[in-house]
Design a protein with these regions (language model features):
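Bacterial N-terminal signal peptides that target proteins for export
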Residues: 1-9
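Bacterial Sec-dependent N-terminal signal peptides
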Residues: 3, 15-43, 191, 229, ...
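An aromatic- and glycine-enriched ligand-binding surface/loop that stacks and positions planar moieties
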Residues: 23-92, 196-197, 218-392
Length: 570
């Protein structure tokens, strides 16, 4: 751990050259031209740049290229997907899918880079929080806003880590100490306190939704409130058997519900009219030949739409020189097409093939199935041309997050399908995908409020379900029915509404380890790997032994001189 933290102190340098390395020269002379930790953190502008550095650190947990981003990790472990990827690739993905190191025993460090990226982000937040009182603030509003966002970023990073590994070091100051793993309750207490700080301190009008074109991506007080509700429900399910007890940090069920109701009553958010318009690939209204300019006919609601409460932003400015800005999990999900740009979809690596069980959960007339899943069997010649290179082919792929194509006019006047990124700076389809990861939608707040016992629970559930069965003319199709707002029905609705959004696995764990392990288990399920039938078995006992948590990277245990201990079952 100690050596790794030394690396983190270097990686905490700010983007765009605003900070340089804080090393000691033999003369020990302060730089007159560059910023470092001794002459920085003076002005409010320094505070703003510090906040940007914290956002950058958080973004790099995805754009930094870990072996598995949190999104891919959780989708692989859920019952929504199989690991997939190429038929001759290493089987590290299958370790996650089966919760079984026997799939590839040498992969003892799968999550080492992800671990380091998260702690690098935490280091930046800690350093800014530690130094904030030394800044000459122009006004308290800016201070409250910037620090509120920073506390929220730290909380989100710790929430991701404690859900993934459970037993992690808790660092609340910028330190190089070799810190042992904390009691999870201590981590959750900090998460609650940080998010509460953000909900209290960030002004309600700091980033109005009406101005999303200029402020989208900033964490608002409502995003912090929504995350508090999510944290409460996860903790209550995993540690309190869904009994509605108070959790560490003093967060209660009533308070979590009040946060959801405050978001709903704010008037800032609402449901996008049609579910499919939430996603670029799903909002394609094109008919006819696939060579058409399908993007021009998209009904996509756009980034920062009225339903988005919290998202992690990306862009296409990344390169291989340390500027890491793209969404690295999108290309992993793309159709594996041997380098071809096929149909309206761009190329990818074929990870996270959709479990047919997930494709079967949607009722007749539920628009969410088509908006969420690519039916590869409906793509012209796809199976004949491409599945020989695909592992764990199921006939289905994720549509919500997938690379896209566009039609480009060549110099001779002909047209070609190319990657949607071609012509945009580096245009590298592997590192420049810029679709945002939407972390919290208004629909989630409605369903969390229902689950937490709102007096409007039935209305909130109906609102979400009606949207799923709404036709293009705005009317409900004949398949819509009202279902009662029981906890079990709400959980089933969440499976349909939030499929492939990085939510399902956590929802399964909070239903109880026995329920989760049996939902995820597979018994001789037949898939195609390299075009040949393969039986997949996922033993529920493997999940139970590990309690649903991931392997602590061996490198981190070694660097800590054994202070860090491996999780049970790994």
């Amino acid at each position: 751990m100690k050596t790794n933290i030394l690396i983190l102190s270097v990686s905490s340098l700010f983007v765009a050259g605003t900070l340089s390395s804080c090393t000691e020269s033999w003369l020990d002379v302060a730089s007159k031209t560059e910023s470092n930790s001794s002459n920085y953190y003076k002005s409010q502008d320094d505070g703003l740049r510090s906040l940007y550095a914290c956002y950058d650190g958080w973004q790099r947990t995805v754009s930094g290229g870990p072996d598995f981003t949190l999104y891919q990790l959780t989708e692989t472990m859920s019952d929504e997907c199989f690991g997939g990827t190429g038929n001759t690739d290493g089987r590290n993905t299958q370790i996650l899918d089966r919760f079984d190191m026997n799939e590839a025993p040498s992969y003892t460090d799968m999550h080492n880079k992800l671990w380091g990226l998260y702690y690098a982000a935490v280091f930046r937040c800690n350093e800014f929080i530690d130094k904030a009182e030394g800044i000459s603030w122009d006004d308290t509003r800016a201070k409250d806003t910037y620090l509120g966002e920073t506390h929220a970023i730290r909380a989100i990073c710790y929430f991701d880590m404690v859900r993934t590994w459970e037993r992690i070091p808790l660092l609340v100051h910028a330190t190089k100490d070799n810190v042992p793993q904390a009691n999870p309750d201590s981590v959750y207490s900090l998460i609650v306190k940080d998010l509460t700080y953000a909900a209290d301190k960030i002004p309600a009008d700091a980033y109005p939704k009406a101005d999303a074109v200029t402020n989208d991506g900033h964490i608002t007080r409502y995003a912090a409130m929504g995350m508090l509700a999510r944290v409460y429900l996860f903790y209550d399910g995993v540690y309190n058997n869904n009994e509605g007890k108070p959790m560490p940090g003093g967060l209660t069920k009533d308070k979590a519900l009040a946060y959801c109701e405050a978001i709903i009553q704010s008037g800032e958010y609402g449901l996008v009219n049609r579910f499919k318009d939430l996603w670029p690939a799903s909002s394609d209204d094109k008919t006819g030949n696939y060579i058409d300019h399908w993007v021009d006919k998209s009904s996509y609601a756009g980034v920062g739409n009225k339903e988005t409460i919290l998202s992690l932003k990306f862009n296409y400015t990344g390169d291989y020189d340390g500027n890491e800005d793209g969404n690295r999990f999108v290309v992993m999900l793309g159709l594996r097409t041997n380098g071809d740009v096929y149909n309206r979809y761009g190329q990818g690596w074929g990870a996270l093939t959709v479990n047919p069980k997930q494709a079967a959960v949607y009722g007749q007339g539920d628009s969410r199935r088509q908006a969420s899943i690519i039916d590869c069997q409906q793509l012209q010649n796809y199976e004949q041309k491409y599945i020989a290179d695909q592992r764990e082919y199921t006939g289905y792929a994720i549509k919500k997050y997938t690379p896209l194509s566009k039609n480009m006019t060549n110099s001779d006047g002909t047209t070609s399908l190319v990657s949607y990124l071609q012509g945009d700076m580096a245009g590298d389809f592997m590192i420049s995908q810029y679709q945002d990861w939407v972390l919290l939608r208004y629909a989630d707040v409605l369903l969390m409020a229902s689950e937490l016992g709102s007096s409007h629970a039935q209305d909130y559930l109906n609102e979400v379900r009606k949207r799923a069965y709404t036709q293009s003319d705005g009317s409900l199709n004949g398949n819509y029915t009202v279902i009662s707002a029981t906890k079990e029905n709400i959980w089933r609705e969440r499976q349909k509404e939030f499929a492939f959004e990085g939510i399902r696995y956590w929802d399964e764990l909070r239903q109880g380890l026995s329920v989760a392990s049996n939902q995820i288990a597979e018994h001789s399920t037949v898939l195609l790997s390299g075009g040949v039938k393969e039986k997949v078995n996922i033993d529920a006992l493997n999940i139970v032994k590990k309690r649903g948590f991931c392997q602590i990277p061996l490198t981190q245990i070694t660097l800590s001189n054994g202070v860090l201990k491996q999780n049970a079952g790994w």
